[in-house]
């Protein structure tokens, strides 16, 4: 039975382009995270954060969350701007992408400069998944 590592090895052996790509430093995914805490409060409660990773000179936003009490004050925009700046400056990123569902935040991402690249209806059933991208 073939395993994923064995299948990748066979695929690499038969694809010079893929073999070369796998040997580049941009192939390795590197984490990128930014967080914000409330300015007031005794414990420095989390107000929001962004968790993503950088791969192939692109920032992949995996999760952006802002506490309900901090929404509407621009914190989400500041978090994503900070992550994009770090991605450009620290990793040489040329773009950013995010997947979001229709009940989440596609409008937010469009307001901060992302454009809709693809939509998949019924993924999962009854929900539309959106891929948004932005040049950095």
Curated annotation (Swiss-Prot):
The keyword Hydrolase does not apply. It is an enzyme of class 2 (transferase). InterPro entries: Acyl_CoA_acyltransferase (IPR016181), GNAT_dom (IPR000182). Its EC number is 2.3.1.-. Residues 1-136 form the N-acetyltransferase domain. Keywords: Acyltransferase, Antibiotic resistance, Transferase. One of its GO terms (molecular function) is acyltransferase activity, transferring groups other than amino-acyl groups. It comes from the Bacteria. Disulfide bonds: none annotated. Pfam families: Acetyltransf_1 (PF00583). One of its GO terms (biological process) is response to antibiotic. Confers resistance to blasticidin S antibiotic. This is Blasticidin-S acetyltransferase. The gene is bls.
